[in-house]
């Protein structure tokens, strides 16, 4: 099968975006076999991407269905940077001309809003603090948790945003142990579905620096849901105000949350190229 796709990125968090409305994909299980996704994600032998995004017809009253597949072939429920690229893709491809787009995800419905300066705001929904909603194993909901591995322990905040997130405070993100601590906490036994791990440096009450080790992808240049998680965790511990600028290795996002409704995350989405590749189904 000749598969048409568009390569996009949100602050360097890159995606292979596939129109599953105007071209046929398998109807059962994953939109593509996991081994085929891993091959396509390979940066030397495939297209190369952090996540694959699939545009599908909505099953309910939304405009589209939005599916996200990690580079390892696993499916996840949420990706903020991907959501911004999704909004730009469906408009550029002529699938809609709406500036407010409702999409179905495995975590529920979300709204994507395109501004006049082509920035895109994503309503990421309300944070979920209860351990079973993150999900993580803990006796009770808390502002922070101590995760132990061997002789080491880390003080983290944890929240569910469709995906499980934990965030720890560091003095300097440039020297943070992302490559070593990231995998340990991602697969920590208290996260039954694994977790995205954020390393947050606070610059001021309205500004942070952040690096994120994503489950199923490793460290990425940006993580929209990770930025939202870091902000609300910082707010919960009275470190941050309602509106926060988040500097990631790939660029800057703006996150707003006043404790009511959903977290609002704003940033760009970039179109890199269109292509086609032969795949075996």
From Swiss-Prot:
Gene Ontology CC annotation, any one: cytosol
Domain of life according to the entry: Bacteria
Biological process terms in GO annotation: lysine biosynthetic process via diaminopimelate
EC nos: 5.1.1.7
Residues given in the record as substrate binding sites: 13, 51, 70, 80-81, 163, 196, 214-215, 224-225
Swiss-Prot/TrEMBL keywords: Amino-acid biosynthesis, Cytoplasm, Isomerase, Lysine biosynthesis
GO molecular-function terms, A-Z: diaminopimelate epimerase activity
Site, Could be important to modulate the pK values of the two catalytic cysteine residues: residue positions: 165, 214
Disulfide bond sites: none
Reaction catalysis annotation: (2S,6S)-2,6-diaminopimelate = meso-2,6-diaminopimelate
Subcellular localization: Cytoplasm
Site (Important for dimerization): 273
Main location: cytoplasm
A Pfam family annotated for this UniProt entry: DAP_epimerase
Pathway membership, UniProt: Amino-acid biosynthesis; L-lysine biosynthesis via DAP pathway; DL-2,6-diaminopimelate from LL-2,6-diaminopimelate: step 1/1
Catalytic machinery residues: 79 (proton donor), 223 (proton acceptor)
Similarity-based family: Belongs to the diaminopimelate epimerase family.
Function: Catalyzes the stereoinversion of LL-2,6-diaminopimelate (L,L-DAP) to meso-diaminopimelate (meso-DAP), a precursor of L-lysine and an essential component of the bacterial peptidoglycan.
Oligomer and partners: Homodimer.
PANTHER family: DIAMINOPIMELATE EPIMERASE, DIAMINOPIMELATE EPIMERASE, CHLOROPLASTIC
Protein name, entry field: Diaminopimelate epimerase
Organism phylogeny: Bacteria, Pseudomonadati, Pseudomonadota, Gammaproteobacteria, Oceanospirillales
């Amino acid at each position: 099968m000749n598969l048409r796709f568009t390569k996009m990125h949100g602050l360097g968090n890159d995606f292979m975006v596939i129109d599953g409305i105007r071209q046929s994909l398998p109807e059962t299980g994953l939109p593509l076999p996991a081994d085929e996704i891993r091959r396509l994600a390979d940066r030397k032998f495939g297209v190369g991407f952090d996540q694959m995004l699939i545009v599908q017809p909505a099953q309910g009253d939304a405009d589209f269905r939005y599916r996200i597949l990690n580079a390892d072939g696993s499916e996840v429920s949420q990706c903020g940077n991907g959501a911004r690229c999704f909004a730009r893709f469906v408009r550029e491809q002529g699938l809609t001309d709406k500036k407010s787009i409702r999409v179905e995800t495995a975590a529920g419905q979300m709204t994507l809003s395109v501004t006049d300066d082509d920035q895109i705001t994503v309503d990421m929904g309300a944070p979920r603090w209860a351990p079973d909603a993150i999900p993580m194993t803990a006796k009770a909901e808390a502002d922070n948790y101590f995760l132990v591995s061997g002789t080491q322990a880390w003080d983290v905040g944890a929240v569910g945003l469709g995906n499980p997130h934990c965030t720890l405070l560091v003095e300097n993100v440039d020297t943070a142990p992302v490559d070593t601590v990231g995998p340990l906490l991602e697969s920590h036994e208290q996260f039954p579905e694994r977790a995205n791990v954020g390393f947050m440096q606070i610059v001021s009450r309205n500004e942070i620096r952040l690096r994120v080790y994503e489950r199923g992808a490793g460290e990425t240049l940006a993580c929209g849901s990770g930025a939202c998680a870091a902000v609300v965790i910082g707010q919960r511990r009275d470190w941050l105000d309602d509106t926060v600028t988040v500097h990631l290795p790939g660029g800057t996002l703006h996150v707003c949350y006043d404790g009511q409704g959903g977290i609002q995350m704003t940033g760009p989405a970039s179109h890199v190229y269109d292509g086609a590749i032969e795949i075996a189904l």
